[in-house]
Each structure stands twice: as structure tokens, then as C-alpha cells.
């Protein structure tokens, strides 16, 4: 089962997101700020597959901090950034830092939860394929070194 | 040199008198009384007095007396002045500006009797630097031929020294007026009170019959009457000049003062809005009120034409310089007030920007959560679940909507926080009311109140300021551990026209890194509420032209310090 960490400083937001992704069969965990998120990311075993984090919590750079912590722990952990109104520029910054994607919390007429689930599924697939690729490469490298022997 | 002046005794008298004149004693009456007594005694005279010119009535009023025979009616004697003979030696001296000495008053054509025992009399004028008579020193003796040339010369020196001191006093008065007015810079007083203050200060330093202030309207197309003492006072905000129209309009357009003793003879004169009937005007100064970028208005001072030809009442160059200086300072004050207003506007706009961004963020988050609940509700309903499964979702939706409403209501409060309806109020009463309102009755938290007596009233919106204090009391109380304390104090501010209010507690205090943020909208370390409290408190204090700071030590308690300006003094409270 894929494990997802939901980071947001609003109880109601965490509850709603968690409920929705659990419905899809994912295992969800919560953190209410960046420092709690960093602790959980560093101690999780195995690492989280996907981290869904709010962009702005204690500071404007909260989302970026969580992102850095996640990829430092496991390069293949995918991070999806949630942005409230007016933070798209920051979200784009996160994309440059290696986030999988960003989801705007408020898009009129759109069920953003369905969109989020879709993004999580895509992120999970990419993680799976990244890990698969890495394992294959690993095997090839091993076989080459065995041939050399 | 004659015998009298050359003697050591004579020099000692000069020394005594000049010491009196240069003394730091500010009470002119004390000094004049002492000089008169010394002069009388040293001249061997029996009686002496000084009469000062009353410019308005063209009379001499006995002001200082010495020697025998003075009683209540005598000391209030007013001497009509005329150049005709038989109308009094004092009046004659005032008119001619020359000394007069007689060895036998009964042979003197000017003499009129106020005391039966007078035989010799000597009177010399006290003239200002423009040669205008300000008063007359009069010395009398019951002996014939009591005074010689040397006495006359001596008395002339005394009169000149007195004139110097009178002039110095006038200058000191003007300096004091300028200094006192200078203090207004940055005080941000209400304009009406400010203009009244200018008129009062000018009237203390220059005797005049009327004074008016015209200020340009917003689009700078007309000079509108904003303040006036006399008749013209009935036409405040009605009487106006176009730029360049009349002497007043010319002054505004050219940025230069005008001083004239006969406005009607001036080709620029139009006589549109006059404080006095045109034929009664004896002197006029119109000075431009100059701001940083342009002329803001005109300060106009008028004196009534004297009915007595000998009483000069045109304004002097010094008068013009003083009025011009006052007008310039008024310009600086109006400019500075405008600047502060603009700065506050900029700050307010910045606060607004932040408020809007943060509100949008918070509303966005709530709406996102509500949409999550709706999404789940739809799912639950599609699954055909029982009502019980829906209840938590409906509750959550209700909470979400409630929080949205909370944001809206705080937002509205932020908007109205700075719309004030002010009047002078007692700060102690406000603080007491707020404490009564916000501090719970049954609690083990101790309340300490220290209210300083005799604080000046503040110009405040009582309802808003009370709310602001209540918020701080409530804030302090909420952070108190058991048996903690909340201390509320009022005291004089850092300047005489400020008051300080302090709210201290023994709670956890504010961490250094949060001190800058606590007044920002939606900043809160409390789980309940949204943190708009302190930003509204700051908004209200700012709107009162006050300041608020948190000066507590983290770990020891919070300390909120508010400094508010006292209400501008009105003319009435000045008189009181």
C-alpha cells in the first residue's frame, strides 16, 4: 500500500484530504507544520511515496522546506504542492526545485479533490517507474561488473 | 555733565536701575515698580508714575505708581491726550515726544491738577525705536524748582533704558509665540484648533483689532476664509478670493507679504471681505502661508485707524517680520500634517494589501475544506449510507461556514476600525470602563489598576478605543496562569501633550521573533480566534494618531504600551 503524508496547518483541510485519499485505498499520515513534517519524513520507514504539502504555513517557504526534506530522504518521493489563492508563483518555484506538480485549492467549478487524487496516482506511477528503472539499471550494472569478473 | 549724574551716588543709581532692567525677572510689573521707586527716591521727588499709551483708545493709562497720595481711583486714572494747552503735562509729552520740565506747575499752560501739593514736575517720553511714544515717566515734587537739567537728562536715560526693556519684552513675547507654535509641528492638531492658536499667539505679540486666515481650497482655485476673530467670523468658509484678487489674492499669488497703513490707497485693494469698515483700517499686514511646494493661504492682520492723530498705529517692519514668520510656520505645520496624513494613508494601504492577501488565503483554505466535505457527502450518499454517517460531515460543513463568517466579520471590523467619531474623553474613564467590561469578576487572576490623576483628555472615539483596551485586557487575562496578574496603568506620556496607557501581565510574554508580526492581520498563536484582534487594536490606535508597542520580556510577561495625543486645546480651555 502506498503511503502518503498530508501536510497542512488547517485541521479541516488535513481531514478532508486524508479522508479522500484513504477512500482511494492509500495509507495517509498527517503533519500540521513543516517541522513536524520534517521529523515524520526523516523517521518514516520505508519513506513516504508521496508528500502532499500546503505551500504557505509558518512562512512563505514552508512548502519548499517540506519538499527539500522529502527528496533528501528519498530522491524518488514525489511531492505535490497545494496552493491557496495567490501563491502560484511560489508553486512554480517548487516545481523548479523538483516537485511533481502543484494543485490550486480553489478552482471554481472543479472538484479539486478528484484532481488531487489523479495527481497522486500519476505521482505514484512515476515513483514506481523511477524505482523500476533504477532497479533495472542496477541489475544491468551488476551484470556488467560480473561479466568483467 | 552736571553735578547729579557725575556723583558716585548717581552712578550707583544707574547701576541699580540697569541691573533691574537686565534682570531675568520675567514679571515686567515688578521691575517697573522697582525702577520707578528708585528713580523717585534718587531724584528726591515725592511722587512718580508711568502712564502707558492705550493705542486703541488714544489715551494714557496710569500703570505704575510710587510715592504718597495714590489711592484706588488715582491709580486707575486715564488721561485724555490732546495737544491743546491745559490738558495735562503727561499728555503733552506723549503727543510731542519731548521732555517737559516745570519749576512751578501753576504757571504752566499744560498743567492740570490731580494732586494739590504738586509744585515742580518733570515728564519724559518713553519712545520705541521708531520714535513712537509708548508711555511717559512723570516725577513730581512739592518744592519749587526741584528739578534741573541734570534731572531731566537722568530721567531721559531711564526712559530710554525702559524702552529697551519694553522692546526686549516684546521680542521675547514674539519669540515665545514662535517657539510655542513650533511645538505644534508634528502634533497633528485639528486644523480649526491650530488656526485658533495662530490667531491667539499673534494677538499676544501684536496688538490688533482683527486677524483672519484664508486657505486655498483643494483644487487651489480660491482662497477661502477659514478663521477670523471679528465681524468676518460670520462668513467662515463663505468669504473667498480668487488668486490675484485684492491684496489677499496678490499675496497668495506672489508669495510675498504686504504691509500698508492705508489699504484703500493701494491699487490692488478691492475691499471684498473686510474685518473693519474700510475707512477705519489703520494698518494691514497680509503674509503668505508658504508650504513646501506652494503658497497654502494668507494670514491677514488689521489694526483700527486711530481717532487721535498723535497715536501712530500703523504696523512696523518688525511686526511684518513676525507675522510673516508665524505664517511660514503655519505653512510648515499644515504641510507636516498633510505629510503625516499621506504617510498614514500609505501605511494603511499596505496594511490593506496584506489584509486582503491573508483573507483571500484563509477564505481559500476554508472553501477548500468545505468542498472536501461536500465531495465526501456526495460519496457517502452515493453509497446509500445511513444518516448517521452524514452527521459529522454536516457538522463540519457548518463549522466551515461559521469560520468563513468569522473572517468576514473580522474583515468588516478591520474596515471600520479607522472610521472615528471623536470628542475629548477622559482616558482614565475609558480604561476603567474597558477593564469592567473585559476582566472577569470571579477569578484568581489579580487585577492592579494605577490611574494617574490630572491627565489631559484625549480626542477619541470612545467606543472604539474602549474596545481596543478591552481586547488588550482580555488578551492579557487569557494568557494568565492561575494566580497571575494583569496590571493596567495610565500616566503622562513622553511629551506634555501625550498620555500613556500600559497593559502588563505575568503570562508567557511574546517571543522576540514574533514581536514584529503580532500586529499583522490574522497573526495568532492562540488556537481560538483568528488573530485579527491585535491588528484591529493597532488600526484603532493608529487612527487616533497614537502608537502601540509590545515592550515585554519573553518569559516574564507581555507589556503593551500605547501613547495617545492629548486633545487639542480649545480657546476655551486655554482661557480656563
Feature map (PLM): residue ranges:
Chain A
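The short loop immediately C-terminal to the conserved phospho-acceptor aspartate in CheY-like receiver
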Residues: 56-58, 78
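Short, conserved "switch-loop" micro-motifs in signal-transduction and mechanochemical regulators
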Residues: 73, 85-86, 97
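Two-component/phosphorelay signaling modules centered on CheY-like receiver
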Residues: 11-30
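Acidic, metal-coordinating helix/loop segments flanking the phosphotransfer/catalytic sites
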Residues: 19, 30-50, 58
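Short amphipathic alpha-helix used as the core "switch/output" element in two-component signaling
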Residues: 39, 61-76, 93
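Receiver (REC) domain switch/output surface
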Residues: 112-130, 137
Amino acid at each position: 500500500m502506498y503511503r502518503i503524508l498530508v501536510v497542512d496547518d488547517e485541521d479541516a483541510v488535513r481531514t478532508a484530504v486524508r479522508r479522500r485519499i484513504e477512500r482511494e485505498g492509500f495509507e495517509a499520515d498527517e503533519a500540521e507544520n513543516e517541522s513536524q513534517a520534517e521529523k515524520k519524513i526523516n523517521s518514516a520507514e520505508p519513506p513516504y511515496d508521496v508528500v502532499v504539502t500546503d505551500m504557505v504555513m509558518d512562512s512563505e517557504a514552508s512548502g519548499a522546506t517540506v519538499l527539500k526534506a522529502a527528496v533528501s530522504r528519498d530522491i524518488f518521493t514525489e511531492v505535490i504542492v497545494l496552493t491557496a489563492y495567490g501563491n502560484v508563483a511560489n508553486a512554480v518555484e517548487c516545481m523548479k526545485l523538483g516537485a511533481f506538480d502543484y494543485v490550486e485549492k480553489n478552482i471554481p467549478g472543479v472538484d479539486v479533490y478528484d484532481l488531487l487524487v489523479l495527481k497522486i496516482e500519476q505521482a505514484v506511477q512515476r515513483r514506481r517507474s523511477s524505482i523500476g528503472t533504477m532497479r533495472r539499471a542496477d541489475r544491468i550494472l551488476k551484470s556488467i561488473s560480473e561479466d568483467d569478473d | 555733565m552736571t553735578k547729579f549724574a557725575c556723583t558716585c551716588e548717581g552712578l550707583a543709581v544707574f547701576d541699580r536701575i540697569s541691573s533691574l532692567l537686565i534682570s531675568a525677572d520675567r514679571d515686567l510689573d515688578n521691575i517697573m515698580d522697582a525702577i520707578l521707586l528708585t528713580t523717585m527716591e534718587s531724584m528726591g521727588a515725592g511722587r512718580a508714575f508711568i502712564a502707558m499709551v492705550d493705542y486703541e483708545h488714544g489715551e494714557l493709562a496710569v500703570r505704575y505708581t510710587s510715592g504718597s497720595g495714590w489711592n484706588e481711583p488715582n491709580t486707575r486714572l486715564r488721561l485724555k491726550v490732546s495737544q491743546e494747552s491745559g490738558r495735562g503735562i503727561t499728555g503733552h509729552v506723549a503727543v510731542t515726544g519731548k521732555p517737559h520740565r516745570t519749576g512751578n506747575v501753576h504757571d504752566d499752560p499744560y498743567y492740570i491738577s490731580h494732586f494739590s501739593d504738586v509744585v515742580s514736575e518733570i515728564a519724559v517720553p518713553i519712545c520705541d525705536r521708531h520714535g513712537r511714544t509708548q508711555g511717559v515717566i512723570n516725577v513730581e515734587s512739592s518744592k519749587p524748582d526741584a528739578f534741573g537739567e541734570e534731572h531731566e537728562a537722568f530721567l531721559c536715560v531711564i526712559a530710554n533704558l525702559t524702552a529697551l526693556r519694553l522692546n526686549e519684552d516684546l521680542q521675547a513675547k514674539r519669540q515665545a509665540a514662535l517657539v510655542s507654535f513650533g511645538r505644534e509641528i508634528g502634533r497633528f492638531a485639528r486644523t480649526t484648533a491650530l488656526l485658533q492658536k495662530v490667531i491667539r499667539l499673534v494677538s499676544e505679540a501684536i496688538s490688533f483689532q482683527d486677524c483672519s486666515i484664508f486657505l486655498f481650497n483643494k483644487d487651489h482655485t480660491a482662497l477661502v476664509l477659514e478663521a477670523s476673530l471679528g465681524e468676518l467670523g460670520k462668513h467662515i468658509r463663505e468669504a473667498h478670493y480668487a488668486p490675484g484678487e485684492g491684496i489677499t489674492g496678490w499675496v497668495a499669488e506672489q508669495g510675498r507679504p504686504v504691509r500698508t497703513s492705508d489699504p484703500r490707497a493701494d491699487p490692488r485693494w478691492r475691499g471684498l471681505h473686510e474685518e473693519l469698515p474700510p475707512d477705519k483700517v489703520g494698518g494691514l499686514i497680509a503674509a503668505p502661508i508658504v508650504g513646501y511646494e506652494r503658497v497654502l493661504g494668507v494670514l491677514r492682520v488689521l489694526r483700527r485707524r486711530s481717532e487721535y492723530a498723535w497715536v501712530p498705529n500703523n504696523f512696523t517692519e518688525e511686526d511684518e517680520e513676525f507675522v510673516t514668520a508665524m505664517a511660514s510656520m503655519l505653512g510648515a505645520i499644515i504641510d507636516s500634517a498633510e505629510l503625516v496624513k499621506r504617510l498614514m494613508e500609505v501605511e494603511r494601504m499596505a496594511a490593506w494589501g496584506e489584509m486582503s492577501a491573508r483573507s483571500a488565503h484563509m477564505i481559500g483554505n476554508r472553501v477548500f475544506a468545505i468542498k472536501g466535505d461536500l465531495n465526501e457527502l456526495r460519496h457517502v450518499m452515493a453509497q446509500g449510507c445511513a444518516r448517521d454517517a452524514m452527521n459529522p460531515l454536516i457538522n463540519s460543513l457548518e463549522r466551515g461556514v461559521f469560520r468563513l463568517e468569522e473572517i468576514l466579520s473580522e474583515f468588516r471590523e478591520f474596515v471600520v476600525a479607522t472610521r472615528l467619531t471623536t470628542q475629548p474623553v477622559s482616558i482614565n474613564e475609558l480604561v476603567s470602563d474597558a477593564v469592567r467590561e473585559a476582566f472577569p469578576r470571579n477569578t484568581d487572576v489579580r487585577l492592579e489598576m494605577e490611574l494617574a490623576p490630572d491627565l489631559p483628555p484625549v480626542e477619541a472615539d470612545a467606543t472604539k478605543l474602549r474596545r481596543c483596551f478591552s481586547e488588550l485586557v482580555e488578551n492579557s487575562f487569557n494568557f494568565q496562569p492561575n494566580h497571575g496578574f494583569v496590571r493596567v496603568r495610565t500616566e503622562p506620556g513622553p511629551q506634555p501633550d501625550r498620555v500613556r496607557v500600559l497593559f502588563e501581565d505575568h503570562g508567557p510574554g511574546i517571543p522576540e521573533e514574533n514581536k514584529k508580526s503580532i500586529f499583522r492581520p490574522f497573526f495568532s498563536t492562540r488556537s481560538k480566534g483568528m488573530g485579527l484582534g491585535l491588528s484591529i487594536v493597532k488600526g484603532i490606535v493608529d487612527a487616533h494618531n497614537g502608537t502601540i508597542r509590545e515592550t515585554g520580556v519573553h518569559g516574564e510577561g507581555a507589556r503593551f504600551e500605547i501613547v495617545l495625543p492629548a486633545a487639542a486645546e480649545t480657546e476655551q480651555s486655554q482661557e480656563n
